[in-house]
Amino acid sequence: MGWNSWDCYGTSVTEEEVLANAAFMARHLLPFGWDTVVVDIQWYEPGARAGGYNDGAELELDPYGRQLPAPNRFPSAASGLGFKPLADRIHGLGLKFGLHIMRGIPRQAVRDALPVEGTDATADQVADTSSVCEWNTDNFGLDHGHPGAQAYYDSQLRLFASWGVDFIKADDILGPYFAEEIAAYRRAIDRSGGTWSSACRLAGPCPWHTLSICAPMLTCGGFRTTSGTAGRMWRRSLPGWHAGLPTSGPGAGRTRTCCRWGGSRCGPSGGLHGSRA
């Protein structure tokens, strides 16, 4: 179990806020199994705002089209250090550090034809520009018929491993079911040299619908979430749990994305408390 920045902070969490919540969790909740701090979506967007997404946002990317922490929100990431300083501080509290990531490759990298690390391919050659997320314009999907697509995920996960990331939450991947994306992440995790937990999350217009997930999900190497944030609609979430039982097994189970208490800065109720459990 752990804490996820989406609840309370939405898209605009800062390093100071992450550390404050991590310190509280280490002091009061770690003895009860709360051991993972996850920085959710838009950590790579300098201009992220509470309350929604910015279409066509300019992102913080490295020369290979991989997301970097926005230094105005995560000052310790300056000078190319990425999330390693923050991860080190989280680890120093006895906790694990996790990141949210959207499937695919940034549209900005495609626009600028940035190279894919270790290959002769460029982002515009490996992108599937017909594959888009319905609610976030940051990324295109990847064309997994091109070897550079797997190479991009491999390089992304190597970078995360070098920062000391322990957990990834891959979003917009189960609704619809992107089997190739899940398999590509699995290979990238195996090749990264890191020790990971992972979660593949539903993202679609009807998050409360029961999912029928195929057996290959067992190779995801972690958890599959049934839907979006639970809020106060627990009974509406139960069908998703039952649907996922056939795909559970050793090292792979069913969980919730978030179980929220209080309000959220991404909505009208203001910032209170939240949790990923």
PLM feature segments, named:
Residues 80-83, 176-188:
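Active-site-adjacent beta->alpha loops and helix N-cap segments on the catalytic face
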Residues 86-90, 183-200:
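Alpha-helix-loop-beta-strand connector modules within alpha/beta enzyme cores
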Residues 121-131, 144-145, 151, 191-277:
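Glycan-recognition surfaces
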Residues 25-161, 165-172:
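Aromatic-lined carbohydrate-binding/catalytic grooves of carbohydrate-active enzymes
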Residues 30-32, 90-92, 161-162, 190-193, ...:
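Extracellular/periplasmic catalytic domains that process cell-envelope and extracellular macromolecules
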Residues 6-8, 42-44, 102-106, 173-175, ...:
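Active-site beta-loop-alpha junctions enriched in small/polar residues
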Residues 100-103, 108-110, 186, 195-197, ...:
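Intrinsically disordered, low-complexity acidic segments that are enriched in bulky aromatics
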Residues 1-11:
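An acidic-aromatic substrate-binding cleft motif
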